[in-house]
């Protein structure tokens, strides 16, 4: 057991690569100063000896990680990090929230790319962005990311980065709309959660739960789904529903987790009421075919992604 001191007031995430551990810290920048360190990514060896850090100053950031999370992936050479922030005050007097995408060289922890400015989805920018997931596909050298946006775009969106290693990710991202949301542009309520991104040999899987968006104004019950995107054609193949909770029922899905069990088996876990202390789960294959329909066991989920260890999901 070893205690690691907080390097900045906010702790935002942990990631393990083949050779290193990474911790992400941050601090608010209420004066909007370009000299304030807002994000620090610290590299450790597997004995938790500190080896280096990437430090981000200013970066158009008032509050790092605000209303979102941190997701990381690596290709052995680079660490890719997707998160979010509230930005410096805009001309309209508001501090708008949006996604951030970073690429960091693992060897020297140099920040190679940091997209923190106002942009659009053709450059992987989402605003507001309320959940972020990232995955590196080593078979194609591609980074995929998903976000839950409430305005630009107002959807569960998948993005693909192919020109990695360049200073500015100079090629534009290719985007797939997985699910469009009802309501007005910028309305924070979307009736949905998005959590989980996995890439297989032929597909990209992303999990979520949502109200019936076609009845946005009246629907209140969220159901769990897995979206299947064809990797070769890069288009949405289908959305597979894993629950069927009725509007007049008591069950209402909370944030699901997508967990890779093997190359062709994926678990989706969720809760409907934290007080019940029950975990719902189902299994699908790489094409989204249901291998085992919804079942329930005693337990609870944390805000950390479950992992597979010793033949069990924990």
Predicted region positions:
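Extracellular, repeat-based ectodomains that mediate carbohydrate processing or recognition
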Residues: 1-314
């Amino acid at each position: 057991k070893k205690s690691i001191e907080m390097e900045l007031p906010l702790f935002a995430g942990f990631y393990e690569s083949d050779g290193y551990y990474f911790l992400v810290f941050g601090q608010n920048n209420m004066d909007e100063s370009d000299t304030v360190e807002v994000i620090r990514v610290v590299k450790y060896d597997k004995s938790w000896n500190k080896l280096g850090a990437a430090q981000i100053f200013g970066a158009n950031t008032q509050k790092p990680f605000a209303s979102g999370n941190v997701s990381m992936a690596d290709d052995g050479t680079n660490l890719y990090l997707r998160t979010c922030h509230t930005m410096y005050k805009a001309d309209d007097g508001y501090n708008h929230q949006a996604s951030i995408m970073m690429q960091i060289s693992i060897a020297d922890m140099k920040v190679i790319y940091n997209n923190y400015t106002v942009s659009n989805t053709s450059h992987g920018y989402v605003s507001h962005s309320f959940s972020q997931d990232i995955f590196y596909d080593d078979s194609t050298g591609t980074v995929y990311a998903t976000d839950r946006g409430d305005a630009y775009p107002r959807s569960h969106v998948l993005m693909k980065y192919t020109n990695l290693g360049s200073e500015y990710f100079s090629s534009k991202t290719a985007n797939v709309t997985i699910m469009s949301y009802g309501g007005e542009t910028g309305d924070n309520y979307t009736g949905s959660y998005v959590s989980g991104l996995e890439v297989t040999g032929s597909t990209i899987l992303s999990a979520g739960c949502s109200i019936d968006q076609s009845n946005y104004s009246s629907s209140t019950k969220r159901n769990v789904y897995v979206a299947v995107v064809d990797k070769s054609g890069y288009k949405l193949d289908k959305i597979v529903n894993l629950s069927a909770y009725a509007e007049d029922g008591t069950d209402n899905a909370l944030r699901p987790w997508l967990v890779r069990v093997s190359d062709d088996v994926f678990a989706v876990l969720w809760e409907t009421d934290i007080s019940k202390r029950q975990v719902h789960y189902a299994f699908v294959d790489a094409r989204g075919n249901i291998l085992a329909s919804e079942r329930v066991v005693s337990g609870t989920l944390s805000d950390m992604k479950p992992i597979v260890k010793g033949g069990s999901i924990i």
